[in-house]
């Protein structure tokens, strides 16, 4: 496996989910975020002690956005042919095997990735354990 290229430190400015106002108070109000539009809304007016709204300031650094902790970006792979794309980019991208790939095909994809020196983010998914 190739080590990733040097990159700035990955900083996640906000890891908690943004919850909808009053979702904790009323069961009928789902937790999925909705922008407050009311003229008197304390959340929209950013009063102290209220929940925070998603804003542009919470965004990640453009260079580290979508990066895994190892420093690679993921590329979805469904078959062995998809791995050929990553041959020249082993320090930047890591393969992620799609969820609809059978366990038989996963074994062959993992073997080919190891031969090419490509990092796989989910190598243990759907593999039968031998007892």
UniProtKB/Swiss-Prot annotation:
Claim: Ribosomal protein is one of the keywords in the record: yes
One of the record's GO cellular component terms: cytosolic large ribosomal subunit
GO molecular function: structural constituent of ribosome
GO biological process: translation
PROSITE patterns reported in the protein's UniProt record: RIBOSOMAL_L32E
Keyword Ribosomal protein appears in the UniProt entry: yes
Keywords: Ribonucleoprotein, Ribosomal protein
CDD domains in UniProt: Ribosomal_L32_L32e
SUPFAM superfamilies linked: Ribosomal protein L32e
Family matches, as InterPro entries: Ribosomal_eL32 (IPR001515), Ribosomal_eL32_CS (IPR018263), Ribosomal_eL32_sf (IPR036351)
Family designation: Belongs to the eukaryotic ribosomal protein eL32 family.
Protein name: Large ribosomal subunit protein eL32
């Amino acid at each position: 496996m190739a080590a990733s290229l040097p990159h700035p430190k990955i900083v996640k400015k906000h890891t908690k989910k943004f919850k909808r106002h009053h979702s904790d108070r009323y069961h009928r109000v789902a937790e999925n975020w909705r922008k407050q539009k009311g003229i008197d809304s304390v959340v929209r007016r950013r009063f102290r002690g209220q929940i925070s709204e998603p804003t542009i300031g919470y965004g990640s650094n453009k260079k580290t956005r979508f990066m895994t902790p190892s420093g690679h970006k993921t590329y979805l792979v469904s078959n062995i042919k998809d791995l050929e794309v990553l041959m020249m980019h082993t320090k930047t991208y890591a393969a992620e095997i799609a969820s609809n790939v059978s366990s038989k095909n996963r074994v062959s994809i993992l073997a080919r990735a190891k031969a090419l020196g490509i990092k796989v983010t989910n190598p243990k998914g759907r593999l039968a354990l031998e007892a």
